[in-house]
Amino acid sequence: MKKKTVCTLNMGDKKYEDMEGEENGDNTISTGLLYSEADRCPICLNCLLEKEVGFPESCNHVFCMTCILKWAETLASCPIDRKPFQAVFKFSALEGYVKVQVKKQLRETKDKKNENSFEKQVSCHENSKSCIRRKAIVREDLLSAKVCDLKWIHRNSLYSETGGKKNAAIKINKPQRSNWSTNQCFRNFFSNMFSSVSHSGESSFTYRAYCTEFIEASEISALIRQKRHELELSWFPDTLPGIGRIGFIPWNVETEVLPLISSVLPRTIFPTSTISFEHFGTSCKGYALAHTQEGEEKKQTSGTSNTRGSRRKPAMTTPTRRSTRNTRAETASQSQRSPISDNSGCDAPGNSNPSLSVPSSAESEKQTRQAPKRKSVRRGRKPPLLKKKLRSSVAAPEKSSSNDSVDEETAESDTSPVLEKEHQPDVDSSNICTVQTHVENQSANCLKSCNEQIEESEKHTANYDTEERVGSSSSESCAQDLPVLVGEEGEVKKLENTGIEANVLCLESEISENILEKGGDPLEKQDQISGLSQSEVKTDVCTVHLPNDFPTCLTSESKVYQPVSCPLSDLSENVESVVNEEKITESSLVEITEHKDFTLKTEELIESPKLESSEGEIIQTVDRQSVKSPEVQLLGHVETEDVEIIATCDTFGNEDFNNIQDSENNLLKNNLLNTKLEKSLEEKNESLTEHPRSTELPKTHIEQIQKHFSEDNNEMIPMECDSFCSDQNESEVEPSVNADLKQMNENSVTHCSENNMPSSDLADEKVETVSQPSESPKDTIDKTKKPRTRRSRFHSPSTTWSPNKDTPQEKKRPQSPSPRRETGKESRKSQSPSPKNESARGRKKSRSQSPKKDIARERRQSQSRSPKRDTTRESRRSESLSPRRETSRENKRSQPRVKDSSPGEKSRSQSRERESDRDGQRRERERRTRKWSRSRSHSRSPSRCRTKSKSSSFGRIDRDSYSPRWKGRWANDGWRCPRGNDRYRKNDPEKQNENTRKEKNDIHLDADDPNSADKHRNDCPNWITEKINSGPDPRTRNPEKLKESHWEENRNENSGNSWNKNFGSGWVSNRGRGRGNRGRGTYRSSFAYKDQNENRWQNRKPLSGNSNSSGSESFKFVEQQSYKRKSEQEFSFDTPADRSGWTSASSWAVRKTLPADVQNYYSRRGRNSSGPQSGWMKQEEETSGQDSSLKDQTNQQVDGSQLPINMMQPQMNVMQQQMNAQHQPMNIFPYPVGVHAPLMNIQRNPFNIHPQLPLHLHTGVPLMQVATPTSVSQGLPPPPPPPPPSQQVNYIASQPDGKQLQGIPSSSHVSNNMSTPVLPAPTAAPGNTGMVQGPSSGNTSSSSHSKASNAAVKLAESKVSVAVEASADSSKTDKKLQIQEKAAQEVKLAIKPFYQNKDITKEEYKEIVRKAVDKVCHSKSGEVNSTKVANLVKAYVDKYKYSRKGSQKKTLEEPVSTEKNIG
């Protein structure tokens, strides 16, 4: 590592690192002086032969003299065994050993090490934060200067005026960039220090040393290191919040470190600060932390956030976005600066170093926590990003709340305000924190004083009134947060500040909207209230802006505040509870105040609708000029902020490990509050948002677009998930927000626990967050224009997101592709260190679209205008609704949890997420499948095929995005080359075999399948359509000949040539040709397996090729595809495609087209396969009754028919769902893989057999028989040829059942095999076809065989069924089978005593078992309750006993009632 690091740093460091790396563990060197040619210097790894060799005096490890000497300079100990040495013996053949004294440069080395380690970290950060770095670069110059100063200060432990001046000069020269970078850098330093500090005091000291040394390094290469540091800072600020929150930094260390920070930061204002290191350190620390957060945001927001002086002008220059950005940055810096000034001026003077020292420690801790808290709030604010998005303009007001000039800037550009908002809130937070820190220093009751001051300010002045409301709300929120924080004054203050900040920001947002000036005013007021010297600067701003803004602001603010109050009231209420729990006097006082506010807020909440209207109106009036949208944003901001605050409280509470329990309670409460607040705020925001939305959208759009450019949008990619969410953006947005908030809370907790992770997480999240705002406007606009057009950004360009395609794709997304993608991403996210990234992404998702719209939607959703959305929100909470959304949400939630949880838990949760995702997808697919099946059943014309195609096409559109790849791939594999396909198929069969082995993996295959399925569907629909157009009717009319000839034509007679060929290369060729024929062969094969599912039907020889595929392939497929089929079944639309593929597109189309004809054809042909399959599918789609009759008629097995009816529907559902979820994999395997694998697997054994049988039957019997024999031979090579056909039919039927039912098929299978299903199947089969004989006899063998395959299928199915439970049918069938088995066991177990006691006869025993099993299996609960079974059995026994005695009625009633119970 060090070597790498060194390499990154510089050659010198590199060498040192090499030595260090050697030191760290180059144990490869030989221990003896004797070395061979192979021996290499452990340090340089060069051969020793050609170099001067030496060894340390204390050991015999051989090194290059140059290396060891250099090493000794760094560290005079053997790199290998660490033995210290003072001299190195140089070995020379002439002179022997020459002792060479070593020059020591331990200090240098140590510094280098520190520097290297620091730089390494920086490098990592730099690499990861390349985006931020650009912005950070701005700070770098100042950072380097500050770093140098900090280093100097640290070394001298003095605040050097020179250093300060130097910094000041630097600031002046590079006011914006330098200050900003410096602040962030310092924050980063502090973050580093704090991270370590939070872990241990020593760590902090070490970090201090590192910082100091690092500063030296910075001096060496200021810019580079500054950049790295900035990057590092970007990382560490994130980490810092958690660390700061932890606030475990020993105060002595903290004071030491903080002074450096303070010296660095304050220097910007006061080169020499009278403030004690501790106090100033604390302030600085809090500030640094705040600034760090701020800096991160600033980074994203602007490169010149730190020029405090310059920011004013830029703020005034609000007109230009950049100037606004700079102004914001400057304003933020200025705000920061003023807090620093305050700290140095007011606090330092007021509180004197000594007195401040103590408060400093607590304060610094508090501030540290506050900073983290602030960060938590920021996290909260990330949901607030939604706010920010909503408040793009509000963001500006928010910023303005941070700084008056910022307000102006906000007015100038909501976009920059949003960015600034992040920064400024941080700045405000830092300022407030600093101010509050000072206040804290001034009195333990600083919170009270702050609140009181705020309240007083409210009382004192209208200006203060506005601020007062801001303050009150902030106080409330802070107080609320405070209780949550468990009375850490710093934290509470921070929360309070955050709350105030949020409130002020909200108010200021409006104010800034109304009057940019005023925004700064409330903040200033707060700052002034806090007794900050900053008030001078801010006061100037305030004074300038106050008058104009004040009246309007008061109105808007008060109203805005009220809405804010509502959430805050909830918050305060909960917080109050927390406060009570925490038993903090200050908290209680705040609580009281809050309670009052809460009462008002409660009233406001009650009045919220009115307030919304009035607010909307008033705000419109007030903010008309500024921007109504800011107000909406403000509301959103307030809402988010409340949530944020809640999250912050939660996070902060979590941060306060001492108050973990409280924080947990707070989290729960806060989550509830968040929900409540969100709802209330949503409602309010909804009304408010609706008005300003139009205005806001443009501004937000512009702002965010600008932000987008200014920010690193690399992070925006996460929106891909968002795009998915955007489909359900309305319903999902809020849930996402809630989930996000929850996640944020979790994340903050996680961050607390993961001090190291937070920095990167936060940085990423921040970037994402910033990206989100930028995205959200675009998304909003896109949504306005094209709800999902933006998705094109996030999704592969292959998919052009048109509204039309969008719907299918939307569905598709719900289907596996996007959910999987999302799941994968989410899982990745959850795996990724940053929960925040995920939550940020989740937020993005929720907010990606117009935050306002989202909020409005969310509100509407919350208002349950859309039960679905509400449900979705609930599902987010209950995970009961839309599986997709829920899944994505759940993933989001679980991911934060996962992050919190152990890796195993992560993987488990991820897998659970995936499963739930799949379940959701399957459910949706199932729904679609049902719809599709209904539509199919409704029409049996080519249009029906088209319907399927459309179902497919639905997938096709989806697939079109994916299918092209697959198609290309398939084309390469051999769409046009059967052999090529053969190759592919070989792989596929292998894959399929693996699938067979891993039926469990079927899910994964299915996951893969979706692509293939897409392709499959795409292809299938196309060629199905072609076939339908080309002559499905003829084929249908002469299904055998047409299909056979068609398939053979398509397959080049591959199927027709010989089953051996078909099953052998021929079979592959068929498939390949089918593919060549647009997948006919493939579909044949896929259909073959489908037909095989329908192979019960599948005496469909019409597809002689199909039969080939169907036969052998189908058989294999049946086994392998049992699960596969399940997948396909889930994909109904895929199923049609597959069916068409299997049967031949035309035959399938024909059957679909001519259901009656097909039925007739089936009955005429007796080839239940072709006719039944199409008839089956159609019938299934049309009616289970028809399906039953047709299937019974067409199916060789009643079981096949019955199951096909039910099964097929389930299959359809399952296949559709699975195909939806897994359409690609399904298609892949259905095409080559699924079919191939089964064929390959089955073919291998059956292959030999059924080539014979198929050939024999093929020749002897029409294709129908060939298909049957083929399937039979494939599926049941063991059975004799005659039985195989029937057997195959049976087997196919049962196995198709298995496939169709996959879980169920097994049951149907097994049941067939067992008795009930089998009996119907054979019965139907004989009735249906002469083949029934075979099925009966063969049914047993095939049945048993199918059992085996079904067992595998069942296993896979079971797993799939877990995911597929959504496909009630397939899971039902599977469940049925399981239930039957279990029921049989239970019944036998229960009846055994009676039988042993001779209470019943053997016949009665059998009858009771049969009836009881049947009853249990048909119970509504679908579960086998041993108690109920026992009761049922007992009832039956009694029934029979009494029947003998003539009291049959009573007995019958009893079982009935028992059965009811069971049911």
UniProtKB/Swiss-Prot annotation:
Modified residue annotations for Omega-N-methylarginine: R1151
Gene Ontology cellular component annotations, sorted alphabetically: nuclear body; nucleolus; nucleoplasm
Composition bias type Basic residues, residue spans: 371-391, 785-794, 928-949
Tissue specificity remark: Widely expressed.
Compositional bias ranges of the Polar residues kind: 329-362, 750-759, 795-806, 1053-1063, 1185-1197, 1303-1316
Regions of compositional bias (Low complexity) in chain numbering: 1104-1114, 1336-1349
SUPFAM superfamilies reported for this sequence: RING/U-box
InterPro entries reported for this sequence: SCAF11-like_C, Znf_RING, Znf_RING/FYVE/PHD, Znf_RING_CS
Zinc finger (RING-type): 41-82
Region listing for Disordered, in residue ranges: 291-428, 457-478, 750-1146, 1161-1197, 1269-1350, 1444-1463
Biased composition (Basic and acidic residues): 457-470, 807-829, 851-927, 979-1019, 1034-1052
Keyword annotations of the record: Isopeptide bond, Metal-binding, Methylation, mRNA processing, mRNA splicing, Nucleus, Phosphoprotein, Ubl conjugation, Zinc, Zinc-finger
Pfam families listed in its UniProt record: SCAF11-like_C, zf-RING_2
Record has Oxidoreductase as a keyword: no
One MF annotation (Gene Ontology) recorded for this entry: zinc ion binding
One biological process term in Gene Ontology: RNA splicing, via transesterification reactions
Compartments in which it is found: Nucleus
Modified residues (Phosphoserine): 338, 341, 344, 400-402, 405, 413, 533, 588, 608, 614, 680, 687, 694, 723, 726, 771, 776, 796, 798, 802, 816, 963, 1122, 1127, 1169-1170
PTM annotation (Phosphothreonine): residues: T331, T410, T769, T807, T1153
General function of this protein: Plays a role in pre-mRNA alternative splicing by regulating spliceosome assembly.
Name of this chain's protein: Protein SCAF11
